[in-house]
Each structure stands twice: as structure tokens, then as C-alpha cells.
Amino acid sequence: MFERLEQIETRYEELGREMADPALIADQQKYQKTAKQHRELEDVVEKFREYREVQNGIADARGMMNEADAEIRAMAEEELASLEERLPQIEADLKLLLLPKDPNDEKNVVVEIRAGTGGDEASLFAAEVFRMYARYAEQRRWKVEVLSMSESSVGGAKEVIAIIEGDHVYSQMKYESGVHRVQRVPATETQGRVHTSAITVAVLPEAEEVDVKIEAKDLRIDTFCSSGPGGQSVNTTYSAVRITHLPTNTVVSCQDEKSQIKNREKAMRVLRSRLYEVEMERQQQALAKERKQQVGSGDRSEKIRTYNFPQNRLTDHRIGLTIHQLAEVMEGRLQPVIDALTAHFNAERLKAESEAVA
């Protein structure tokens, strides 16, 4: 591990020198590429330098233990205990930083939320979960753009498809895919009974054109009049677009914009991301089979979370996390949940990596 860390540090320093070269600065495209590589190595190098500093401090403290002065020996003993306590965490951080990066972590995401079992109550909850993600995105200074929304008659959402753009969005949102279950007393319930409803969430990394090759001959594009809640026509022009990818029978519709061109662009963004996810799943399954481990962080059929409103309780079933701050989470304060999930799945990756090496 340490030989690899030294190689990374050497490369980091080389990139730093290259960035100071006026010839590179003049070529902004190359400069940006070099700066990106430099940034990607920065966290590892800083942690490695911290590790080395602590190791040197431990060596110095041990040397001072031989001093004749009792006060100096006591200080050295205290310093040694403090540094040795820090070392295991730094080593764990280094191992984590050396894990292969998820190439999608920096990407924007397409979020698809659909009401499942529970009728009107499920549609209301789907709208609330979308609002929760929108509030969370606002706190992270991300941009949310609704691509498509199908409203229910009670003001909920049968389906919401949106793009969230910003810094490392997929890295924070990727563990949200799955079935989200809600337990509460609906406003229409006269007996005060708790009902259970469910929605599905899919989080897809937004694919660029270079990520997925789509042939024009593989697409069927239909246009139709936009419709609102209950099916009434809201637009007399054929601005709504439905795109079918014939080889996979993947269908995407978009009718939010008045312009057919804009609706087509939005639909293509979703289609690219769905096809990219299909290819990602195929690769993950092949890797899981090879390593004989289960891939479970993105299965949309997996019940991942329960929101119990009477008890103000959120439970994430994948990691056994329970918090009694549901009201705050629904306001977008989702970071503690995301941090716990990230820590859990990173630990799983570390374990899998260790077993693969063994």
C-alpha cells in the first residue's frame, strides 16, 4: 500500500509542476484536464502526508522516552499515546481513499419517483418525497429541473422525473433507489387507522452522449397533445413527445415544455440515462458473479426505507438505521442518513476488496 502511496505522491508533485508551466497554462483544455487529475489525487496525498507526520511524531516521542528528565518523559508518553490513537483511523481513511472510484460519482442524476401501492395516499407521498429531495438539493446548492410530472386528482404525483445537477450529485443520491414505504393515518381516514403505502425511487447517473451510443434508426418518435390531471387537453399543438428505443423497448415521454424540440431534448436525456443504467447493471452483475458477492445498493424492488409518521421515525432497513427525526428529514435534512449509508457501503467495499486480495 505504501509503495503505491509514494507513487501517487510523486505523480501529484509532477502534475503540480506541469500546472506551473506557461505553455500548459496557454492551452486551457489541457490545463483543465491536468488540474482535474491533480485535484483527484489531492485527498490521498494530504492523508498520506498526515500519516507520515504522525509516524515521525511517534518516532520522536519514543526517542524522548529515554530522556533523563522525568517531566520530558511524561510529556513524551502523553504525546505518544495521542499519536498512536490517531494512527488506526488515518490508516483506515487511506485504505478507503485507495479504493477504485465510482466513475459515476461526479455525474448529475435523473430521479424517477412513482406512486405504488396505496392509491391517492401513495401519490401524495411521492410528491412529498420529491419535495424532500428538492429541499436537500437546495441545501447542497444543486439545481433541480422537472422533466416530467403526472399529477394525481388529489394534488399528489403519480410520477415525477427530474434532473438534479451539481457537484458530485450521484455520490450522494445513489443509495436512494428502491421501495420507500410510508405508514400514517390518511386525511380521509375517519377511524384513525394507520395505512401503509409505497413508492419506488430510481436514481440514474445522467449519461452524456459519449457514454451511450444511440442510433437514429433504433428510435421511434411519436408526438401527441399534452394532457393535464384527469386527461384533459392542455395544449392543442402536438408538442408532447414519446420516444421508444426499439432494441430494448424502453419508452420515455415528455410533455412539460410548450416546445416539441425541448420536450424531445428532455426525453433523450432520460432515455440515455436509462440505457446507461441497463449497461451498468449488466456489468455489476458480471462482476458480482465473478467475485461471488451480492450487489444490493441499487435494486429498485428492494424495500429500503420506512417512514412512520405517527412515531416520527425513519428506518433504513439495509443498514438497521433508525432515527426519530422524520419531520426534519422530510424538510430535506437527509445528510445524516446519506452519510450513514455511504459509510456502510464503503465498509462493505473495503471488506470485499480485502477478500479479493486474500
Swiss-Prot record:
Keywords: Cytoplasm, Methylation, Protein biosynthesis. One of its GO terms (molecular function) is translation release factor activity, codon specific. Methylated by PrmC. Methylation increases the termination efficiency of RF1. The keyword Cytoplasm applies. The keyword Membrane does not apply. Belongs to the prokaryotic/mitochondrial release factor family. PANTHER family: LD18447P (PTHR43804:SF7). This is Peptide chain release factor 1. It comes from Acidobacterium capsulatum (strain ATCC 51196 / DSM 11244 / BCRC 80197 / JCM 7670 / NBRC 15755 / NCIMB 13165 / 161). The lineage of its organism: Bacteria, Pseudomonadati, Acidobacteriota, Terriglobia, Terriglobales.
